């Protein structure tokens, strides 16, 4: 796709969390940027720690008796972790030559996207997810729901090999 008429940059809204620093998403952003002037607005939902596929919060040593350890994190902790991921991703994309910034949004990715689009219109949405066997977002049919709700084209980037580095 090319930039809209008048040479204004094409605006992409990227929603990701655990795959935000994946090579696959960075390559997709590079590919889109190669189509012409573009800007990327990253939306990182403040996902509760207990909902992550891989827990990213270090825990102090503690005995676990009678069952699995429950991961409980505060909303503030979720926002802090999301902000750290966002800052690292913006820095990485700048190093790759992309114009990018972003925000931490609601824990619900659809609500986070809706809030971001009210403030910053976009021409296309890019959704990056874990592999289908692990992705809550795919079980919720997020890419299709966003396309239907906002009437924008949606590119889905599935990261096929999710590792601890991607957490």
Annotated model-derived regions:
Residues 1-5, 94-123:
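Structural beta-alpha unit
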Residues 11, 124-126:
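Structural motif
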Residues 151-167:
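Short, flexible loop segments at boundaries between secondary-structure elements
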Residues 128-145:
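Glycine-rich, Arg-bearing micro-motifs that act as flexible, cationic patches
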Residues 79-87, 140-143:
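Short, surface-exposed alpha-helical segments at coil->helix boundaries
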Residues 3-70, 156-161:
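Small/aliphatic-rich secondary-structure junction motif
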Residues 24, 28, 85-88, 112-113:
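Well-ordered alpha-helical segments embedded in enzymatic catalytic cores
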Residues 65-83:
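A short acidic, glycine-rich active-site loop
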